[in-house]
């Protein structure tokens, strides 16, 4: 069954490769000022995190009842994702923030499992149509390395996020500019300020999309 599942996803994404190349790489959906915000926290052990935990705390304080944070490490310590519960959470969200540390140039295993299980369930039941049409995906990433490490001639953060971007674009979601911070390690004496500035960038990005939508410019 696992082999079939993986093969199915690969074939689906390959089949849409031509379609992807012609699609815009920015959000082109409509989001109102009342759009709900769903945060999927993909850190495998948030209690030991400083940057990710601080960012989530600021988001919760700022948005209050408008935001819902799902801590995958608390909900699924055994990696057994409750797909129906996750799809219910997705249903009313206008913005979906994927909050995670960059591990080996990708998402942590728990977040990858969430993506695989939740999206595959839509595919196998042929129930994907329209589910992500009016949703913006924001990759909010903390990075342990320095800015120089992810600057030309090296590969950029955006390059490492392409698989994630194309995964969500192929299902019809909007892809907002990612928000990321460097030097997110305990040895960084300015880590609290780094996390706060990351939060500010997230707020600015969300407000920008809401403002444009309210003006009817999309």
Predicted regions and their residues:
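A short beta-strand-loop structural module common to alpha/beta enzyme folds
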Residues: 65-78
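Helix-loop-strand module that forms the ligand-binding subsite of alpha/beta enzymes
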Residues: 84-165
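Short, conserved loop/helix-junction motifs that constitute active-site signature segments
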Residues: 30-32, 128-134, 171
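Structural motif
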Residues: 76-84, 187-194
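Hydrophobic/aromatic beta-strand patches that form the interior of the parallel beta-sheet core
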Residues: 38-40, 70, 97, 138-140, ...
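N-terminal beta1-alpha1 ligand-phosphate binding loop
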Residues: 27-65, 181
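Glycine-rich phosphate/pyrophosphate-binding loop and the adjoining helix
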Residues: 31, 36, 60, 163-218
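Bacterial Sec-dependent N-terminal signal peptides
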Residues: 1-27
């Amino acid at each position: 069954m696992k082999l079939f599942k993986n093969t199915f996803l690969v074939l689906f994404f390959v089949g849409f490769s031509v379609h992807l190349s012609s699609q815009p790489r920015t959000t082109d959906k409509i989001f109102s000022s009342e759009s709900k915000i769903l945060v999927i926290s993909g850190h495998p052990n948030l209690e030991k995190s400083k940057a990710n935990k601080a960012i989530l705390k600021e988001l919760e304080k700022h948005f209050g009842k408008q935001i819902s944070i799902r801590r995958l490490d608390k909900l699924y310590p055994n990696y057994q994702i409750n797909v129906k519960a996750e799809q219910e959470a997705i249903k009313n969200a206008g913005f979906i923030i994927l909050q995670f540390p960059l591990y080996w140039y990708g998402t942590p295993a728990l977040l990858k499992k969430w993506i695989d299980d939740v999206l595959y369930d839509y595919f196998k039941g042929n129930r994907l149509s329209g589910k992500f049409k009016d949703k913006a995906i924001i990759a909010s990433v903390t990075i342990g390395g320095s800015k120089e490490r992810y600057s030309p001639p090296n590969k950029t953060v955006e390059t490492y996020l392409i698989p994630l971007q194309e995964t969500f674009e192929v299902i019809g979601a909007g892809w907002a500019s990612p928000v990321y911070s460097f030097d997110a390690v305990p040895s960084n004496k300015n880590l609290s300020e780094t996390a706060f500035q990351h939060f500010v960038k997230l707020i600015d990005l969300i407000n920008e999309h809401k403002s444009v939508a309210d003006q009817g410019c999309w």
